Amino acid sequence: MTQPRLVIVESDILIRHPLAEYLRECGYQVFEATDADEARSIVEGENDIDVVLADADAPNAGGFALATWLRREHPKIKVVLAGNVAVAAEKAGDLCEEGPNLSKPYDHQLVLNYVRRLLASRGPSR
């Protein structure tokens, strides 16, 4: 079985990097992106990305535009939008598997459990 591959989209390195390191320690291959444009480049350049975890307020195109693009161009990739913007809840619910269940600051264990649930829901691994 190959390592699940995740992209974390977060402009703040003090948030992004510790979460990425934690998920790596838990057995995931993690790519880090500072904005939606960088995340798109990673998704286009890498094979078999499983999950994209993006800040709803990501710079450039933003997390919602990224999620919309992923749904259209890469429908097999699971999308998680995170943030603390209550107004965005309805829109996030339309773009994510289960709505906006992650808030910031991230609880690393909650993120890990959420990612595991998403990956388990897609069926057998590649």
Language model features with spans:
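Alpha4 helix (beta4-alpha4-beta5 surface) of REC/receiver domains from two-component response regulators
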Residues: 65, 81-103, 109, 113
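Acidic, metal-coordinating helix/loop segments flanking the phosphotransfer/catalytic sites
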Residues: 32-51
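C-terminal output helix
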Residues: 106-119, 123-124
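Two-component/phosphorelay signaling modules centered on CheY-like receiver
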Residues: 13-31
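Conserved acidic carboxylate
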Residues: 10
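Conserved phosphotransfer cores of two-component systems
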Residues: 44-47, 69-76, 94, 117
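Residue-level signal for the "D+5" position in two-component response regulator receiver
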Residues: 32, 58-61, 105
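Conserved phosphotransfer microenvironments
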Residues: 54-71, 86
